[in-house]
Amino acid sequence: KPSGFSQERWDALKMSAPSDLEVELFDPAGNLATEIAINSDEYFVLHVSGKVDPSVISDFKSYAALNQLLRIGIKSNDGQQTMWQSTPEKFEFSNGRFLCKIPVMISKSSKSGPYRLHVAYYFKELFQREIFCR
């Protein structure tokens, strides 16, 4: 557990996975991407938002805690290779929801696809969706 957290607070936070998740991928032009067309190495932007239990929201905002709990990324379809995985550094909060926007470099050399967008919280998969390459 991160320093500054009592065991009780840490346990409460671990059990309070975000709910009502929305995960969207946007292409470099800012359009919603349902599939990925890779012509060159390109930056896509992954938007992840969800609802956080009000009792843990101040702890949830701690970067040290999120760094150990939240994983957002893109996996290859066999699940073996995680192309990209990260804890975002910037969160926006409003009305009990968080939003983070994460730049994702997708390289044309990795164009096999399909990939899976995924969000996990304390090792538990909360969300995944296939995204195809063309």
List each model region and its residues.
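Short, compositionally biased P/S/T/A/G/V-rich stretches that sit at domain boundaries
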Residues: 1-44
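Acidic surface patches and DE-rich sequence motifs
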Residues: 27, 76-78
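Internal, hydrophobic beta-strand segments that form the core of beta-sheet-rich folds
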Residues: 44-49, 66-75, 100-134
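Eukaryotic beta-sheet cores, primarily in C2 and C2-like/PH beta-sandwich modules
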Residues: 58, 69-75, 82-84
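Solvent-exposed serine/threonine-rich low-complexity stretches and specific carbohydrate-binding patches
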Residues: 79-96
